Structure formats: structure tokens, C-alpha cells
Amino acid sequence: KDNVCYGVLAKDANNNEMCIKAGYTIFACGGIGGLYDHSTNYPHLTGDAIAIAIQHGVKLENVDYVQIHPTTLYTKKKGRAFLISESVRGEGAKLYGKDGNRFANEVLPRDIMTQKIREQMKKDDMPYVWMDMTVLGEEVIKNHFPHIYEKCLEEGYDCTKEWIPVTPA
């Protein structure tokens, strides 16, 4: 009414329509992560619901807030990016540019770490930076991060013995 949403018209499990009235309505509809070349999201997340809301004059807030993970395993393969968890950096993994020098404090907040990585990638003219997990030791890697270890092996990297390429997604 008057371009204000006072609830939602929905269907229950038996396909019966019901009206749910509310003083405020939050439209949480997924995101746009699938639009990015490198993303941990599924490719079908393209912001369709956001576009529909805009077409109907719905006032949207904070749509520019997109979470970017600083470190995912770089690959040329299409599909979802594989997250190299922030906890790996929290355990002590280090990041390096192509010159072999560290360029940032690895435990910076995600948005700042992502910015630092992107700046280094631009400086190096590379689609990734290097992560050194070897400093954690083989036992820690295999026991604390077994899924990451296995995924790196699938991509041709032994993260217990060599640096791995990582990129924001």
C-alpha cells in the first residue's frame, strides 16, 4: 500500500494462500555471488530477486555489501572457487607476492586483506598471490585442514611441501 510493504502473501505446505502482516518486511533473497568470475557461490546466484524488487519499486539497502573471501585456491577451471579458510592464516600461513616477499599482515579483516591481495596481484600482474602453509607443518595441515590438503592435492599442489596460489573470491 502506498509503495510500502506490510507483509507477504505466501502459500503453506498445502498450497493454501495466507497473508502474513508485518510492520516491517525484510527481503532476504540470496545474493549476486554467481556473477563474479571467481566466487565461492553457486553460479545461479545472480541477483534475480533483487532485480524483481527494483522493478517493483522496493527500496533496497546495503546491496553493495558483498562478502569476498580473501583466499581461495586459484584455478583456471570454471565453477565454484574452493575456500582456503581464514583459519589457515590464523594458524600462521603467510602470503607472498611473486618476488617472494610478504606484503601484508595475514590476519587483517577480510575486506582489508582482500584489498591488499588485489593490490599485490595488480602490482605483480598476476591472477593470484602465493600462500605458504608449509610453515604450519605437515601434521597440523593434515589434522586441522584435511579437506584443504586433499583439494590442493587434487589441483596438483602438495601444500605440506610447496606454496599454493590463492586469489580473492
Where are these regions (language model features)?
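A conserved short coil-to-beta-strand element within the FAD-binding core of flavoproteins
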Residues: K1-V4
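Short acidic, glycine-rich loop/turn motifs
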Residues: A10-N14, G97-D99
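Core beta-strand elements of the Rossmann-like FAD/NAD(P) dinucleotide-binding domain
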Residues: N14-Y24
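An anion/pyrophosphate-binding glycine-rich loop and adjacent beta-alpha core
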Residues: I52, V58-P168
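A conserved FAD-binding loop/helix module that cradles the flavin
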Residues: L35-H56
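Glycine-/small-residue-rich beta->alpha transition segments that form the dinucleotide
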Residues: A22-Y24, A28-G33
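Glycine-rich phosphate/pyrophosphate-binding beta-alpha loops
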Residues: G31-G34, H38, I68-T71
